[in-house]
Curated annotation (Swiss-Prot):
Any single Gene Ontology cellular-component annotation: cytoplasm
NCBIfam families found in the cross-reference section: PRK11175.1
CDD domains to which the protein is assigned, alphabetical: USP-E_repeat1, USP-E_repeat2
Cleaved signal peptide residues: none
PANTHER family with a match to the protein in the record: UNIVERSAL STRESS PROTEIN E
Subcellular location: Cytoplasm
Keywords from the named record: Cytoplasm
Family label: Belongs to the universal stress protein A family.
InterPro entries: UspA (IPR006016)
Chain's role: Required for resistance to DNA-damaging agents.
Protein known as: Universal stress protein E
Principal location listed in the UniProt entry: cytoplasm
Transmembrane segments: none
Length: 318
């Protein structure tokens, strides 16, 4: 039995084609498990009208939920008839990301899949406010699915942070690699690559310190990263040819290598902080995500505290 046995798929209400559902079925066919197709809907006009009694408004909401449930059933019919176990749940909620996270917590889902919309001309993925809320706050891994089939001979690229002094990063690196290898083992033996980017010498240092040698600095930084990468790959028996230590900004290096390797998915860690430090899902991670042209799997560290309460009953669920 593989990892990710209890999958939640966030249904896109605006189109019949559901890439996230397709990807979930692809995983279940190779990895086992079950799927729940989930949709949170809301229409302010149903709550604004004063011409309807509370009972009538409730009945109208339930009618809309019933219609949407039937629509999702039609999208799932082929998969269900093929033997894929899919449950369907539609709820009335004015904040989709909260409804999704509450469902993750309530039903203990271990993976969330959601479609990511693609910019037509740039090929990069466009993330909505709901997407960002989920990436920051959802306690289980979040797989953002591009509207493309898995590439032929596609790889998985794991972005690890080997330069941070943040104590959360070392165990998070281990978790990223471990979970990706476990998943890849069950999904067509997908090759797993590791990538770490290291910074170039700040120009102002060379100007302010005449005796400073940028080449010595760069060699030292690269050496530190190579040693750390070797230690990481050896823990998992990964061949050196599958590891990459590249000079430059992560938001440039990681998407470029993903494209070069024909990556089907980039796996990275999100610390999911809130408040002021939310600027660092962290700043670097958000820039990387914005530049990707493939699927994204974002994983939180162990012990992550979800800021959303999970014990609310979903209103008017079906």
């Amino acid at each position: 039995m593989g990892k990710y046995q209890n999958i939640l798929v966030a249904i896109d209400p605006n189109q019949d084609d559901q890439p996230a559902l397709r990807r979930a079925v692809y995983l279940v066919q190779r990895n086992g498990g079950t799927i729940k197709a989930f949709l949170a809907i809301y229409d302010l006009s149903y709550d604004m009208t004063t011409l309807l009694s509370p009972d009538e408004r409730t009945a109208m909401r339930k009618g809309v939920i019933s219609q949407r449930s039937a629509w999702i059933s039609e999208q799932c019919r082929f998969y269900i008839d093929s033997g894929i176990p899919i449950d369907i749940k539609v709820v009335w909620h004015n904040r989709p990301y909260e409804a999704i996270i509450q469902e993750v917590l309530k039903a203990k889902h271990d993976l969330l899949l959601k479609m990511a919309h693609q910019h037509d001309r740039l090929e990069s993925i466009i993330f909505t406010p709901t997407d960002w809320h989920l990436l920051r706050k959802c306690p289980c891994p979040v797989w953002m699915v591009k509207d493309q089939p898995w590439p032929e001979e596609g790889t998985a690229l794991v972005a690890v942070n080997l330069s941070s002094e943040d104590p959360l990063h070392d165990p998070l690196n281990l978790r990223l690699v471990k979970e990706t290898l476990e998943l890849a083992e069950h999904v067509n033996q997908t090759p797993v690559h590791l990538i770490s980017a290291y910074p170039v010498t700040p120009i102002n240092i060379a100007i302010e310190l005449p005796d400073f040698d940028p080449s010595v600095y760069n060699d030292a930084i690269r050496g530190q990263h190579l040693v750390a990468m070797k230690a990481l790959r050896q823990q998992f028996g990964i061949d050196e040819k599958f590891t990459h230590v590249e000079k430059g900004l992560p938001e440039e290096v990681i998407p470029d290598l993903a494209e070069h390797l024909n990556a089907g998915v980039v796996v990275l860690g999100t610390l999911g902080r809130t408040g002021l430090s939310a600027a660092f899902i962290g700043n670097t991670t958000e820039h990387v995500i914005d530049n990707l042209k493939c699927d994204l799997l974002a994983i939180k560290p162990e012990g992550f505290t979800c800021p959303i309460e999970g014990n609310e009953d979903q209103e008017d669920a079906e």
